[in-house]
């Protein structure tokens, strides 16, 4: 029996096409994935992300524990509410999950992890917390709604109370703040401005309806995937997993190597991989007809004339750009051109940084 979020009936009211997503009944679209995608790029759209897992880490050792658990360093977080993206690695430097950590106080952090990895993540966090003075508490009674797009903040402001709007006024990107019953964060998975709003389940349906009444378009998993791929954001299970280290997943910027004596889980293995050199995750652009897809092989010839092969991890048609884009894991000797094998022939592609659209515009 699939899990249902508190907003399940609201999705049916909007004629959502529901699909199984890692054991959750979630909306794929509400009629037109392209229209939903464009709403987020041009106006405002919203996503039910209540399947995500909210975990509070509280205690005297909360900071020390998270500095051990995560490859990024929560000690960098000095201002209450500041958020940090990074990976949780195993001893071999494989990515168990990618997650966002919010610093609330020195003894209180909030972590949001993926739904597909929930049980594995919670078990790993519980195991690693042994010996630390921390309490790890999952918060299943909290729902989450992401409101994204150039007009998202203005439309959300019409739904928030005056006190809530005052609390978040001037909040910079990648912050979160408790404002009344809501935890409002300037984070997202689309490359647009907006909020991710953590809301008590008993208030979630009313908030969803209020956002609908403001003209915020409901968006499903289909648009969520094309938006995140345009923004060059990884999807766990496709672009990285426990067999992939973060350096090979365009997550090198999330690894805090300094201070050198911080012995985070996976550090030694990751240092060995770094020194040996790893594959890298790049962006591909194909302006010919056709769509780049997961698992298609990528070929290129290096400066010495040697052919190398990689693989597409995520691919789609980009509604914003009007042609196909992809992320691919390839040997790091790749230049600025390559070929992808599709329908038994090789098609030329451009190699770019894995960041295709930012704030509605081409980013490469």
Curated annotation (Swiss-Prot):
Gene3D superfamilies referenced in this protein's UniProt entry, alphabetically: Aminomethyltransferase beta-barrel domains, Aminomethyltransferase fragment, Probable tRNA modification gtpase trme, domain 1
Cellular component, GO, one term: glycine cleavage complex
GO-annotated molecular function: aminomethyltransferase activity; transaminase activity
Protein name: Aminomethyltransferase
Uppermost EC category: transferase
HAMAP family: GcvT
Keywords noted in UniProt: Aminotransferase, Transferase
Gene Ontology BP term (one): glycine decarboxylation via glycine cleavage system
Record flagged with keyword DNA-binding: no
Catalysis performed (reactions): N(6)-[(R)-S(8)-aminomethyldihydrolipoyl]-L-lysyl-[protein] + (6S)-5,6,7,8-tetrahydrofolate = N(6)-[(R)-dihydrolipoyl]-L-lysyl-[protein] + (6R)-5,10-methylene-5,6,7,8-tetrahydrofolate + NH4(+)
NCBIfam families recorded: gcvT, PRK00389.1
Function: The glycine cleavage system catalyzes the degradation of glycine.
Subunit record text: The glycine cleavage system is composed of four proteins: P, T, L and H.
Key word Transferase present: yes
UniProt-listed Enzyme Commission number(s): 2.1.2.10
Similarity section: Belongs to the GcvT family.
